[in-house]
């Protein structure tokens, strides 16, 4: 996001991966949330079509939650580009 011209504040709420990115000033104000959460007991190795946990009993991502952060960043960049036109 910094490469796209956003101001990025990292490490919010005591979490090193938490951030807020801002672009521009004035109105409209548009907010986009990207979140990752984990569900219990679904740790899974990538690209393995059968149950094969990375860590037995550990949480993992499901239901598309693993794509929300990437989609949020793409949306923020698209909105910024539209605002700049």
Residue locations for each model-derived region?
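Acidic/His- and Gly-rich active-site-bordering loop/insert found
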Residues: 1-61, 70-85
């Amino acid at each position: 996001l910094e490469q796209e011209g956003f101001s990025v504040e990292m490490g919010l709420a005591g979490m090193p991966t938490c951030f807020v990115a801002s672009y521009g000033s004035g109105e409209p104000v548009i907010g986009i949330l990207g979140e990752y959460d984990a569900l219990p007991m679904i740790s899974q190795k990538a690209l393995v079509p059968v149950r094969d946990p990375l860590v037995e009993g550990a949480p993992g991502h499901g239901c598309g939650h693993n794509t929300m952060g990437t989609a949020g960043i793409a949306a923020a960049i698209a909105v910024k580009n539209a605002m700049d036109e």
